[in-house]
Amino acid sequence: MYKNLIKILIVTLFTLIPNLSIASAEISKIINNYNINVIFLRHAIAPGYGDPNNFKLGDCNTQRNLNFEGIEQAKMIGNYFRINKIKFSEILSSEWCRCLDTISNMDIGKWKEFEGLNSFFQNYSDKSLVTKLLYKKLNTIKDEELILMVTHQVVIAQITGISPSSGGMVLYSTLNGKSKNIVINYK
């Protein structure tokens, strides 16, 4: 009896709270059930906060970068997508080194840098330009596509209202603007 009550409460909470985190979710079912066509992925673990004052785009020595744990996390994320047979129509990444290193270490296919995913947290990129480019891209995504976007917490929050942790995913539908924060144990 209590097990059924708990199940009902969980289902009710999931229905009432659209951005509820889901541990070890069956991502393919969620993608299909919620018409998801974008997966926003926050870069893997890069210790620290923001970027150094001498930040220069394209120069990883002037940026906050992945540590060993972040590199391993990126590899596990890539393995997760492969194991779950999740294929992407397109893979895009912020031009920041920690995002490029995340997607490189995931090793899931060809990808392109996209200015519309760059961080505007410390004004190293123009927020209005980044947002304009990203919305323009989102408006061109077809219903049947699935696009992976490797980016930053501020960019994901700007679009979805959700702030994922490093290596966290937010599933997003351009059809209805709904999003789901997904917490996965990649191990």
Predicted segments, located by residue:
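Short, well-ordered beta-to-alpha junction loops that form the rim of enzyme active sites
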Residues: 93-96, 150-154
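Bacterial N-terminal signal peptides
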Residues: 8-17
